[in-house]
Design a protein with these regions (language model features):
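Long, continuous compositionally biased terminal/linker segments
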Residues: 158-180
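Acyl-donor binding region in acyl/amide transferases
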Residues: 3-141, 146-155, 159, 166
């Protein structure tokens, strides 16, 4: 995790190699970048994930964080194989312009690959990784464009969660009624 005040000291956020974050950095809002994490497969989707989200909610409340963001990954870099889920994210979950990072121009991979009326929504959502689904359930968005990370064999998308726009029902679930 990297708060905006710490990023200023470091000179940048980690995900700036992949995404132009100027719209977030100039927003005047308190930011928190979430880095890559991995939870052992035996604990994914269970109580461990709930406790991680709950601890994060406490940190967000303690530091008055307004916008959380970070990179999440699909396995693989074959864009054609990811066309449905990427297109679904672009068409249904694109961040509002005032908080929408964009993949760096020199590495920009469009996510708008399939016309919206040709997307198999069920199949596309099944292909979306659980972490991305969790952000979407909370009211999260994706930035514009993806980044093909050949070193890690992933296709990365930028996730953005504006705490003021969070889904109230799921906010209560993940925060145990913490004041977010």
């Amino acid at each position: 995790m990297l708060r905006d005040d710490a990023a200023v000291k470091l000179g940048r956020f980690y995900s700036e190699d992949e995404y132009d974050l100027s719209v977030l950095k100039s927003s005047g809002r308190k930011l928190l970048e979430l880095g890559r994490s991995c939870l052992h497969e035996d604990y994914r989707g269970g109580a461990a994930m709930f406790h991680l989200w709950n601890a994060l909610a406490g940190y967000v409340a303690e530091h008055d964080i307004e916008v959380l963001f970070g990179v999440a990954s699909f396995h693989g870099t074959e864009v054609a194989a990811l066309a449905q889920p990427l297109s679904l994210l672009h068409n249904r979950h694109l961040a509002p312009k005032d908080i929408r990072p964009r993949a760096q121009a020199d590495v920009f991979q469009t996510m708008d690959l399939v016309p919206e009326d040709h997307i198999d929504r069920r199949a596309a959502m099944l292909a979306v990784p659980p972490l991305i689904k969790a952000y979407l359930r909370l009211g999260g968005f994706v930035g514009e464009g993806a980044y093909l990370d050949h070193a890690f064999n992933t296709t990365d998308v930028c996730l953005i969660l504006d705490t003021a726009r969070m889904n109230e029902k799921n906010r209560a679930l993940y925060t145990k009624e913490r004041n977010l």
